[in-house]
């Protein structure tokens, strides 16, 4: 299996309670507290829990990632394994309502905004565009990350068809960073046109 953004889903009917609200609500927080120990026990990080409701049906979307000190992406095999673990946890959830649900488990993928220090750690070695609060925006390769901020080696554009030049390293404190986004490097794409560690196929179970 390739390392990739991956997804697995399974359909269930859960035992018994009341109404579920939309994403980023107390029910999502409750499920996060329920599922996080299982995610951590499998050496993963629980990035997010989102609940979408459509009539009598609900979708529980769980986003998992590798710990910040690891490199690469979450493989489809890992997604499939953690999906089974989380499915069992939801089936045995004493606080669940009676509506059927789909469980979707995925990894963040290359398009995730870099909004937390751990996101920057996970993106080390990648090229990112950083919008700063004051001053010019910076596009460069993430060289290092520490408690204070991010050090990038700027990519300086030259003539079309020529490889960009590297500038002097720039240290950006976290409190100066508005947003960050990893840029796709086409030279790193696999034969199917996908970045092997960050984008990829979906899997349904």
UniProtKB/Swiss-Prot annotation:
Pfam families: DUF150_C (PF17384), RimP_N (PF02576). GO terms for biological process: ribosomal small subunit assembly; translation. Residues 1-12 have a biased composition (Polar residues). GO terms for cellular component: cytosol. Its main location: cytoplasm. It comes from the Bacteria. The keyword Cytoplasm applies. Keywords: Cytoplasm, Ribosome biogenesis. Residues 1-24, 186-205 are annotated as: Disordered. InterPro entries: Ribosome_maturation_RimP, RimP_C, RimP_C_sf, RimP_N, RimP_N_sf. Required for maturation of 30S ribosomal subunits. Belongs to the RimP family. This is Ribosome maturation factor RimP. It comes from Pseudarthrobacter chlorophenolicus (strain ATCC 700700 / DSM 12829 / CIP 107037 / JCM 12360 / KCTC 9906 / NCIMB 13794 / A6) (Arthrobacter chlorophenolicus). The gene is rimP.
């Amino acid at each position: 299996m390739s390392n990739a953004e991956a997804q697995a889903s399974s359909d269930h009917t859960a035992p018994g309670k009341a109404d579920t609200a939309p994403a980023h609500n107390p029910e999502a927080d409750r499920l996060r507290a329920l599922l996080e120990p299982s995610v951590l026990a499998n050496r993963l990080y629980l990035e997010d829990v989102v609940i979408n409701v459509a009539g009598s049906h609900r979708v529980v979307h769980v986003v998992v990632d590798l710990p910040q000190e690891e490199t690469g992406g979450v493989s489809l095999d890992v997604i499939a394994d953690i999906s089974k673990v989380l499915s069992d946890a939801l089936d045995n959830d004493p606080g669940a309502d009676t509506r059927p649900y789909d469980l979707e488990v995925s990894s963040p993928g290359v398009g995730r905004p870099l909004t937390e220090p751990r996101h920057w750690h996970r993106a080390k070695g990648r090229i990112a565009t950083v919008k700063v609060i004051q001053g010019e925006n910076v596009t460069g390769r993430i060289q290092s990350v520490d408690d204070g901020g991010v050090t990038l080696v700027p990519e300086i554009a030259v003539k079309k068809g020529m490889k960009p030049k590297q500038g002097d390293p720039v240290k950006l404190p976290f409190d100066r960073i508005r947003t960050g986004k990893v840029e796709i490097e086409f030279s790193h794409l696999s034969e199917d046109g996908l970045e092997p560690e960050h984008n990829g196929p979906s899997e349904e179970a």
